């Protein structure tokens, strides 16, 4: 295979095993459960105390589920996450509890939580007797938090919960814990991108900005580009494969315009294009089959057709027998003299008289007997000889040369004696056409490698009237005095699964260099693990604040202050309580109505 030809992995997830919590989760006090509730992938694990709290979350699965048909009739129930295997055959059935990055369907969210608790080995009866650290969206709506708290406290009866933002947990994991750090977080995930200023360890929610673009929109854009480029492979260009191209073959251009100019050079294109090999079959149907194989295939098709017809006959026979039993039961009602029930049954059967019932019973009995005979005949004649309909070729008559032809040949024999030199014939080389079937099933991914991830810097590429990361970053910085700007740009932090493109850090540094004053300094830091650092940070926070009652929402707080209540901490949203308009007291309303009636009475007098 060529150096720039790559095969799709088409990874298929394996079902998660049901783990055992082990003695580490049940110590002197319950160990917290850490749930990174992402819109693309959910991660769950234990915040185990000790020098080695564990390398990574025990569960990582796609935050989607699919309900199988016939679940209420004993069929397969809803499948969640890795239990789905390959997502593409089920794409039309997939459902997510999220609208963008906000959970809105709590029924599906309950399925995800059930899956997490079951596979983590939570064995407490009737409740989840562990504190929970749960991530939520930036500026999460109060209604969403209220429904989530209601689900956790009422359904799972947890002792306490702490809510936090995934990017702030990632920031908490990567910066020193001994200082109240300030910085500017650029978080880009599956559905949206956020610019989050942090001042002295707390989120400045008033100046947060959101861009409604992320990895999902980049994958959709790449899919449309390649489907327009290769309309013959429309079905093979799936979203899962586009996500694979984004994760493994795309990069961020430091200068988008200059990079496009490079791709115009044929040599640069040939050296940098990535050819994605689609699966294909090189065996042409019918071209290499022998007569015996064709005969065997015909027999298999005939046998399969016979089995299908037999199955249909049995199903029809079963239905006819059930209907016949019902009609015979109605006839017994007539014979026993239960006329009221008999007439009611006739109405349900849409019949008018006992004679019509008797006629229908006779016809149905005859049909059942005939069906049984057909089934017996079909079972007796399972072995069927398949006769080849190819006509026999008559024997060819022997072709014998006549004497006249032999004499004519002998007349020309002296002209071609052994001394006569042979005339040299010109050598004609025939070129056989070569068709590379593998090359026909290749997707050449050239400029698409930089066009798809570029949408978070230029949303206009997909027709979105939004500002990109650079413009939004400049807008947020302009809302602060110069001294605070200098403090924020000293710690620009990149996190989220959509910042893992090669060249992302260099592009942000270039944009900052263009917008900052001449010879000013700044520093850009990429998270050590942009995908898992949110879970690591939530685990670290849970261990550091396990005894801090000012950071956890207890069941008592939930019952007294409502489900939307939030205790603020260094990685949380800002709590903004619901302010309802004050209603006038009944006494003031009575006085007002009394004054109005007295005024009307004096006017009448």
Curated annotation (Swiss-Prot):
Residues 593-605 have a biased composition (Low complexity). There is a cross-link at residue 283 (Glycyl lysine isopeptide (Lys-Gly) (interchain with G-Cter in SUMO2)). Keywords: Coiled coil, DNA damage, DNA recombination, DNA repair, Isopeptide bond, Nucleus, Transcription, Transcription regulation, Ubl conjugation. One of its GO terms (biological process) is regulation of cell cycle. Residues 581-605 are annotated as: Disordered. Gene3D superfamilies: 3.30.420.40, Actin, Chain A, domain 4 (3.90.640.10). It holds the Pfam family Actin. Residues 287-328, 355-384 form a coiled coil. CDD domains: ASKHA_NBD_Arp5. GO terms for cellular component: Ino80 complex. It is found in: Nucleus. Component of the chromatin remodeling INO80 complex; specifically part of a complex module associated with the helicase ATP-binding domain and helicase C-terminal of INO80. Belongs to the actin family. ARP5 subfamily. Proposed core component of the chromatin remodeling INO80 complex which is involved in transcriptional regulation, DNA replication and probably DNA repair. Involved in DNA double-strand break repair and UV-damage excision repair. This is Actin-related protein 5. The lineage of its organism: Eukaryota, Metazoa, Chordata, Craniata, Vertebrata. The gene is Actr5.
